[in-house]
Amino acid sequence: MAAAAAAAGSSDSRKPAAHPPPRDFLVHVEAYLSRRDGVDKLLKISRYAARLALAAGPLPPAASARLKSFESSVGLSRKAFRLGKFVQNVNALRAHPHPPPAVALLAYGGEGVYYFLEQFVWLAKAGLLPAHLLPRLQRLSAWAELLGYVGSITIKLEEIGKLESSVKMRLKEGCREESDVVRTLRVKLLLKRMSVVQDVADAVMALGDVTDGKGLLGSSTLMASAGLLSALISAHKNWNSC
């Protein structure tokens, strides 16, 4: 009896884990929209879709004016959503052992400074702060954003290397490609690679801001495409995580 029970238990342990039932779509939408990042990424998609439409070709003057007004309004709305967001970067640095690694300081510190400065950019664009402060604030913000992405990409490339090593180790241990552990690692690897693509796209836009759109970085189609790609990847990640 004990042997049979053990065999049954062993057989049960080899069965693939049961997948949770699919979530109700509207409940999922509610959870997504209750997140600050969820709404922000929908606004980002809207903004860069409008920019891409403007860059794609000549539009009737009335339609072009409406799209430009919409794009500008959405951009200002997104900055309002960043109020206090720098606190998450402060907490991320606090979670690291002291002193934090240089690359973590670059990633979280750069992004934190960017979000902190963006609050003042928003106040200047909204008219509360003097308009003459805006160019300097935007330049400092763009540099902080770019440095943050350099650190973030570096960290994620290191994590990709570790995940690839873990997959190879599992396969050497006899795990098959279709096993749950390998499939889970493959999914994490894919998501991490997508995150790097997103950061590269955002870094290209930040570099365009830093260089005042000189050369290829002055292409409105390239910048709009990079922004839309980043927004879609981020929206996908947020949707899957909520």
Swiss-Prot record:
Stretches in topological domain Lumenal: 124-214
UniProt-recorded name of the protein: Peroxisomal membrane protein 11-3
Pfam families tied to this protein: PEX11
Membrane-topology descriptor: Multi-pass membrane protein
InterPro entries xrefs: PEX11
Membrane-spanning intervals of the chain: 103-123, 215-235
Role this protein plays: Involved in peroxisomal proliferation.
Record-linked PANTHER family: PEROXIN 11 (PTHR12652:SF50), PEROXISOMAL BIOGENESIS FACTOR 11 (PTHR12652)
Record lineage: Eukaryota, Viridiplantae, Streptophyta, Embryophyta, Tracheophyta
Gene this protein is translated from: PEX11-3
Tissue distribution of the protein: Expressed in seedlings, roots, leaf sheaths, spikelets and endosperm.
Residue span of region Disordered: 1-22
Cytoplasmic side: 1-102, 236-242
Top-rank lineage group of the source organism: Eukaryota
